[in-house]
């Protein structure tokens, strides 16, 4: 099983300069071979790697950076062409220095006189990571580095718009997935905008609406940016301030979702949610911003991953299942809930008073139970 660990890098001046050189060289190699492919046609990655050796003489500055990062840049281009040929994406584009700055390098192992060496290594005791050409770099990101055990595959170094540097390390670990156990509890969850998650037990997790909280601050900074001279130092400073606000929104949202998911998975063996069509829902311009801010897909993906690791069950009911229209007691359907302002309604058949969201989550739970019995 592959796991990714992300750390913040604390660089000295020489390391920072070398990272920016590597960004530029990796981008140069990518654009050089993309331009050649456009002129003469698609070239295989192996042939491009052979030609790369000749570029060192023509462009001596390429010798200053990690050679593995340049080969990885070639394989990234090859992946872009593979996606294009498979019609998963458009034709590869040239990279510029104003877009995301990153490069990837592979872990290379060797043995000398019975001692194993590796160009990428994590030193848990000192909170440091060894990277090619950069040497030892201080890191921060995990409280317990001792929990990281496995074989390092590669590392991706990136610079965020906020000016911070990060490394993402891919580690191959022994797959420790708990065997499926006999479930003793089940919960259905309904996803919403006002309350982010509503469970069939009646518990509601509020939506902090991180974007709405900082919207005024973003508007003020974006207005300030529009009045500044593009390319000036003040323009760059304001762009960083805007990026930091977006980073705070993203981190706060993710932290809240992690806490909600952990609480739900911890106390339930079967979890059932909706399979929402977020793209279609976002066409409602009155709710689009709130729906995107809620990050429904992140919740579902995290639930799927957590339940798999812990040997529990996760199901999604059909997108068009009428969970809000159906009475959870007698199964009678109604059209009164087509109006989103109706939060509570009384069933005409059995007289049961239904809370819109709790009723939907109960129906989702029952539907998930049917799916569970069909699959076991």
Labelled PLM ranges:
Residues 1-376:
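Nucleic-acid substrate recognition interfaces
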């Amino acid at each position: 099983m592959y796991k990714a660990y992300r750390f913040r890098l604390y660089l000295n001046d020489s390391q920072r300069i070398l990272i920016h050189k590597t960004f530029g060289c990796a981008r140069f190699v990518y654009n050089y071979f993309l331009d050649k492919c456009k002129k003469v046609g698609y070239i295989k990655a192996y042939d491009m790697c052979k030609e790369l050796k000749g570029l060192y003489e023509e462009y001596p500055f390429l010798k200053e950076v990690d050679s593995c990062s340049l080969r990885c840049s070639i394989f990234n281009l090859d992946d872009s062409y593979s996606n294009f040929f498979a019609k998963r994406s458009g034709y590869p584009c040239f990279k510029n220095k104003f877009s995301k700055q990153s490069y990837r390098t592979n872990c290379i192992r060797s043995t000398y006189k019975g001692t194993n060496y590796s160009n990428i290594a994590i030193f848990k005791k000192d909170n440091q990571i060894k990277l090619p050409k950069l040497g030892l770099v201080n890191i921060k990101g995990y409280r317990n580095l001792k929990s990281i055990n496995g074989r390092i595959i590669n590392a991706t170094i990136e610079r965020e718009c906020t000016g911070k540097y990060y490394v993402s390390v891919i580690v191959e670990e022994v797959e420790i997935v708990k065997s499926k156990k006999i479930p003793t509890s089940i919960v259905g969850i309904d996803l919403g905008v006002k309350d982010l998650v509503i469970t069939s037990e009646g518990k509601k997790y509020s939506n902090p609406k991180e974007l709405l909280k900082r919207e005024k601050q973003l508007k003020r900074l974006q207005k300030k940016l529009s009045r500044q001279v593009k390319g000036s130092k003040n323009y760059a400073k304001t762009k960083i301030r805007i990026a930091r606000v977006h980073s705070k929104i993203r981190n706060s949202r993710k932290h809240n979702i992690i806490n909600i998911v952990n609480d739900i998975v911890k106390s339930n063996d079967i979890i059932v949610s909706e399979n929402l069509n977020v793209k279609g829902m976002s066409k409602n311009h009155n709710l689009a911003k709130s729906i995107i801010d809620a990050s429904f897909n992140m919740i579902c993906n995290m639930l799927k991953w957590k339940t798999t690791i812990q040997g529990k069950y996760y199901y999604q009911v059909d997108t068009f299942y009428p969970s809000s229209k159906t009475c959870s007691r007698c199964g009678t359907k109604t059209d009164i809930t087509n109006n989103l302002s109706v939060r509570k309604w009384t069933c005409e058949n059995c007289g049961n008073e239904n809370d819109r969201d709790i009723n939907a989550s109960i129906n989702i739970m029952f539907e998930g139970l049917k799916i569970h019995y069909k699959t076991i």
